[in-house]
Amino acid sequence: MDEKPYQLLGEAREPLEIRPGDTKKLDSEYIRCGTCSIFVFTEPLADYRHVSVRQHRTKRDWAEEIRYLLTEIYPEHEKIILVMDNLNTHTKASLYQSFPAKEAAALANRLEIHYTPKHGSWLNIAEIELNAMTRQCLDRRIDDIQKLSEELSAWESRRN
């Protein structure tokens, strides 16, 4: 799993088509519409990925994504092996800070966490998936979190 910040940007001026049939030209000026975080989970051998968008990237956001992964995507699995970078929010402690102790313990006991080494982000397949997603889906300005979520859902459907 991995996540990335995303800057929501709008157009200051409508893109112009200089000549009929030409690509529309974007103005270098834009309107900043806030930021959000994109979370990606991937299971390479099953050719599966899940993408979600959240307003923030807090311990609570990470814990809620993990709960979704364990209860909605893999409810029947006893143990999930999670490979991710060593970010301060990526700990089982985040589960205990976000949920009642009994629920947090149940979730934490189903996780087997492996951290990628420092300067070894290329080992994190979810990061590779994020790069592909950025090139294939986020190659333009998107100004609204709902629109971003819809675009990423469509990308996820095509990729899965």
Model-flagged regions — what are they?
Residues 60-81:
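Short, basic/hydrophobic alpha-helical segments
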Residues 118, 126-145, 158-160:
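Active-site proximal helix-loop segment of RNase H-like, two-metal nucleases, encompassing DDE(D)
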